[in-house]
């Protein structure tokens, strides 16, 4: 590493960006069961199991409410065709609540398969690290004390932006994991709504929202792949420009590229909702 403070500061901020983006790449292919050693998943499954009793109680309640609202009298309920429909609805709702965790994991595995397929088709197995161009490092190191003063300000601002963007993008990916955990933990309660016709929309909305959260991973991966190809050609460095102008031009274009990626990742949930009509 260079002994120049300006170069060191820029290299450290780029190292933070590279580390966070590598972590994003790893998290997108990781299952919630393996996240942080599986300790969080164990707590979530325990909560899911504890709420199962409440979900089954609500299942009966929603079923009764649905019967009362749908049929005008008990005589209609006793008709074979109506009784069969009610039995099938209750059985399906009971199965959805009881095996809700397995169904949700199956849906997540489908999306994880999509992520693996996208990664394989793109031919990109990891993210290429961003490094400072050698000609820019040489130009900065050749500057005198007074020539370096403008670059200090540019470097401080640029490094701050890059570091903040690094944490924003990793927080967005962590937020997706936490949303999956929350959906999984309380799943028995909204899934019980399938038992009644008036309340079944709650269950449908829950499934759609959960599917959208899962699909966010594929959208984030696509954004990272596009950025990887886009950033394969680093910002051009004007060798004839003054060192301060050279650093400003390079850092400015680099931050713009990063903003595009971070903005796309932050909008992943909105993109999925627009795709699914939510």
Where do the PLM segments sit?
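Alpha-helical transmembrane segments and their helix-start/interface "positive-inside/aromatic belt" motifs
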Residues: 1-10, 80-100, 203-213, 268
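Binding/recognition "hotspot" determinant
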Residues: 1-58
